[in-house]
Structure formats: structure tokens, C-alpha cells
Amino acid sequence: MHKLFVPYVMGNRDFIENVKTLSEAGADIVEVGVPFSDPVADGPVIMNVGNKAIQEGVNIQYIFDQLTENQDEIQSKYVLMTYYNIINHYGELAFLNACEQAGVYGLIIPDLPHELVQQLKARHPERKTNIISLIAMTTSNTRSHQIAKDAEGFIYTVTMNATTGEDGKFHPELKNRIKDIKAHTEVPVVAGFGIRTAAHVKDIIEASDGVVIGSEIVKRFENDDKQTTIEYLKTIRNVLN
């Protein structure tokens, strides 16, 4: 069964080329991080490239413009990971309209709790962009069932009680939790945070519908040549097929 490959890239000066590379390597959905000065959910690797992107003058408008201009060349769906402050500053309606124009499939807003996500959805019933739900391992069953029921696009389960990309084992209850969440939703459930290797992927997709890989891919785009990165992406894609 085909599982979803959801790689993450930081929206920096050359992010659009990275998005195209990921798309060609078989990404189902590419997650594009919007650089932000206080990224509470990001580990050191992503924080560093985010700071660099801010210094390069990258902002949300640059990301929208690049996606709008290049959307016909990108086969994968793509979502933005952004903090609510950026949306609020831009104006919710204007932001959602810009997303639609740029072909954005969904938004992940890590600092917006479920109740506020639901209010945001209710304020914009006409929007075409999905608001993607996050569920952490610390979330109670009752609450995670509610989030799962309300979800659209896909659900992003946080596999570790930590920020992204830190080493460590997956939560022992993780697979059971993912199966439980899947039983309460119509949308795919993908797992992310701390996934790096083909072995990690193989382990987690016993329960999940796919994986999000962030820090590892960001690091490879920063440090490796393109061909080495493509080989890595293919290994992950093969495990997911």
C-alpha cells in the first residue's frame, strides 16, 4: 500500500528548487516552513536555516510569489507550516486568498490550539485551503478523538514529546495511539518529529499512513550535493511504496 511521503523544507531563497527536487523524488505533500523569529516548535537545525532565511530577506510574500509562479511545475501537493502571528499580520482572509492563488493545499499552524483552529475554520467557510491538525502524544484520548473527527486534509501526529529532529526512540504507545486516532477520522494520519532513517520509517508506517521528515532533509539540502540528497529521498520513497 502506498504510504505518504511528506518532506519538509524551509522557505529560503532557493526553496522552490528544493520543492521541485522533492516533488520529482516522489513526495506526496511537501511541507514548506515559513521563517519566523520565534519558532517554538522547531529544533536547532530548522531554527538555524529559518534565521538564515530571515537574514536573506525571505518573508511570506516571497514564498507566495514563488509558489504562484511555479505551481504548474510542482506535481506534489504542498502545505505551509506557519505561526499564527504571520497569518494575523497579513490578514486572515487575504492570507487564505493568497494560499488559494498559490495552490497551497493546507496550513499547519503549530501555535494554534484546536479550539482556535475550529474558530478559524468557522470564520472562513468558503476557503479551499485545508487547516491541518496536529496531535501530540500528550493529548488526552477524548481530545485527540475530537481533533481527529474535525480534521481535514491529513493529521500530523507528533511522535515524540520534544521539538523536531532530536534523536530518541519513538513513544512506546505511539503505534497504538496512531491506530486509535485513525479509527476516529476519515483523513490520513502521518507521523513526524524525530524521523530520520529508512529504519525509522519502516517502523512507524506499521501504524501510520505516512511520515513527515524535517530536520534530516533540511540538513541534507544544506550540506550534501543534490545527487546524494536525491539518493536518500529515493530510499525513503522505496520504503513507503
UniProtKB/Swiss-Prot annotation:
It is an enzyme of class 4 (lyase). Tetramer of two alpha and two beta chains. It comes from Staphylococcus saprophyticus subsp. saprophyticus (strain ATCC 15305 / DSM 20229 / NCIMB 8711 / NCTC 7292 / S-41). Belongs to the TrpA family. It holds the Pfam family Trp_syntA. The keyword Transcription regulation does not apply. The gene is trpA. InterPro entries: Aldolase_TIM (IPR013785), RibuloseP-bd_barrel (IPR011060), Trp_synthase_alpha_AS (IPR018204), Trp_synthase_suA (IPR002028). It catalyses: (1S,2R)-1-C-(indol-3-yl)glycerol 3-phosphate + L-serine = D-glyceraldehyde 3-phosphate + L-tryptophan + H2O. This is Tryptophan synthase alpha chain. SUPFAM superfamilies: Ribulose-phoshate binding barrel. Gene3D superfamilies: Aldolase class I. One of its GO terms (molecular function) is tryptophan synthase activity.
